[in-house]
Swiss-Prot record:
It catalyses: shikimate + ATP = 3-phosphoshikimate + ADP + H(+). ATP binds at residues 17-22, 125, 159. SUPFAM superfamilies: P-loop containing nucleoside triphosphate hydrolases. Catalyzes the specific phosphorylation of the 3-hydroxyl group of shikimic acid using ATP as a cosubstrate. One of its GO terms (biological process) is aromatic amino acid family biosynthetic process. Mg(2+) binds at residue 21. It comes from Bacillus licheniformis (strain ATCC 14580 / DSM 13 / JCM 2505 / CCUG 7422 / NBRC 12200 / NCIMB 9375 / NCTC 10341 / NRRL NRS-1264 / Gibson 46). One of its GO terms (molecular function) is ATP binding. The keyword Acyltransferase does not apply. Its EC number is 2.7.1.71. This is Shikimate kinase. Binds 1 Mg(2+) ion per subunit.
């Protein structure tokens, strides 16, 4: 693996439900690296779910907390596989920090394929609550333009989580971006 990549955290970005956590766990096992899910770390430390945090403390509090955790990860850890929440890259400061200090992989999925997963996602994704299908599609497209800032894009539409993880490991070993 390219030395420049080997010493960096590998950050997975993409829309909610694309498989960042599942794929990240698989990649971490294949590479023998630790896995960090930023949302899970926040939930563990605050002893509440992200939906509960949105409800009790508000989205602004969550986004600030998320930024602090991501900055901490970027500045003080190396060599991990890290899953960011789907909205994290909306914050320009987070984008810049991750792109500067980490190797960022965008897990892409077509709207039609994401829509098939939607019913499984809505309950645990507060930003989807009370949105129409048109509003969800708009959010999907807005975030997709933000995810354009990355080092490697991986299409997940025609791959299982295992196949996607294998592809990522192969690309990292080749040092391709």
């Amino acid at each position: 693996m390219n030395a420049a990549i080997r010493d960096k955290n590998i950050v997975l970005i993409g829309f909610m439900g694309v498989g960042k956590t599942t794929i990240g766990q698989l990649v971490s096992k294949k590479l023998g690296r630790d896995f960090i899910d930023i949302d899970h770390e926040i939930e563990k430390d605050f002893q509440m779910t992200i939906p509960e945090m949105f409800q009790q403390k508000g989205e602004a509090f969550f986004r600030q907390t998320e930024k602090e955790y991501i900055f901490q990860m970027c500045e003080h850890t190396m060599g991990n596989i890290v899953s960011l929440g789907g909205g994290a890259f909306q914050q320009e400061e987070i984008r810049k920090k991750c792109l500067e200090h980490c190797f960022v992989i965008f897990l892409d999925l077509r709207w039609e394929n994401w829509k098939q997963r939607m019913d499984l996602l809505i309950e645990n994704r507060p930003v989807l609550h009370n949105r129409t299908i048109e509003e969800m599609k708009q959010l999907f497209n807005e975030r997709k333009s933000i995810y354009a800032f990355h080092h490697l894009k991986v299409e997940t539409d025609n791959r299982s989580a295992e196949e996607t993880a294998d592809y990522i490991v192969e690309m990292l070993k080749l040092g391709q971006s």
